[in-house]
């Protein structure tokens, strides 16, 4: 059982001894703060019940809880206060035992039902029922008794409002979370991270992303040293496609050393790319592929290659397309490598890579033959260029372009005395 609740129950049991002393009843209870509150009459158990309660208390103080309970179970009284007092004592004792919380709640509910307990005991028991109900996942009951406690005491209590918000969360009544969690946040002696998380979850679960982000922004301001808050805010910005704010947030987190997960590094790289900074997208991902934080696979290598290509860093792009192609069964990666080599005017390397794409079974044969024609032509190999232009003519997607190249190749070859 929850240690805090168990402590409360023990305190409540010990208070039974004090309640029997008439001196206690001269004290004004501070349990109720309502402006028009007038303390009710003070009651003490009748002599017969009081004796048995005393014996039960003695057994309890000697750690004989079962014996104490048997004494209390044996009490038979028609007096409403004595019955409520006894049921409260039984409920408190049961609450200290593992697995007896639900039975405890039943006795405590019977104790408060007639509203005959002394004021402080009445409100304390109402609160205990609520806490035990929350522990036992009886959320509707917990909410009922927390609300009753607030109504009876006129008090503002962080724990009560926080637990009410939690009960609403557990029952997926997300809209209901806001009122109590706002009060809990206002009452907290110091900022409570979980309270802000509950508030954020309320909005997020209802797809109210603007409000979700506002709460998360506030959370980052209050807990700037919590790295998880930064990345969560960044991901929320990505969710609403505010890529500039997302990048700014992830960059600040990165500079503070807060990015430690592969998904976070990948997100930063992706955001650089989305914000048209492909060279940074490539370099950050390359760095953490080398460190081992991000697993090296075809997808990551291709991402680095693509970013370098966008940045017109063709040498690096060709290298990473080649690495990716070796890990993959995708021949089109060799095609991409070949096109990058062509941009670098490395025609021989382009031809080798493009041939690997063909040998690997690429279904883009027409475009590959056309690219190989161009690479061979620029490399001065008109015979090979002519061979590939004829192959390119067989593909509908490249036939027209190939036909326009064919006479040009023939003319160049003729001018140089080369027979095709």
PLM segments and residue spans:
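N-terminal leader/linker segments that initiate helical-solenoid repeat arrays
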Residues: 2-126, 134-140, 144, 170, ...
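Solenoid-like repeat scaffolds
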Residues: 37-44, 73-81, 112-118, 147-155, ...
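Generic helix N-cap/helix-start motif at coil->alpha-helix transitions
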Residues: 44-53, 81-87, 118-127, 153-162, ...
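Residue at a conserved register position within TPR or TPR-like alpha-solenoid repeats
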Residues: 59, 94, 133, 168, ...
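Structural motif corresponding to the intra-repeat A-B loop/turn of tetratricopeptide repeats
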Residues: 62, 97-98, 136, 171, ...
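TPR-repeat structural position
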Residues: 65, 100-101, 139, 174, ...
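Alpha-helical adaptor scaffolds
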Residues: 298-312, 318-363
